[in-house]
Amino acid sequence: DVEYEQRYQAALSLFNKRQYRAAIEQFEALVAANPNHSLADNAQYWIGECYYLLGDYRAAILAFEKVFTFKNSNKNEDAQYKLGLCYYNLKDRERARQEFQTFIDNYKNSKLIRKAEEYLARL
């Protein structure tokens, strides 16, 4: 519905202004209000991005993992890549290796494939 989309755009605007904590609150409210809305998976993804940019990689991991609970999400690819980056930044080499390998196996045509392969080569 229109109101949900307006609230989503407002939350995205906060993200773009680097007001990540405020954006997290707004995105979480959207997911809670209607987890079946077509933008709910995107809202969940942006929660992960906010935490990632705040340097809270553990919270980002939890948020990105929730993206996969949404059916047919268009954010699965990006969430999988970001999981690799989160573990990489946490210096968890084994888990980062797993996540990047999963990304490479599942998203062979991704524009991020080369970057994922570069990270994997560093591990």
Residue ranges and their predicted role:
Residues 33-39, 69-75, 104-114:
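Short solvent-exposed coil/turn linkers within tandem alpha-helical repeat scaffolds
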Residues 1-10, 14:
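Acidic, proline-/serine-/threonine-rich low-complexity intrinsically disordered segments
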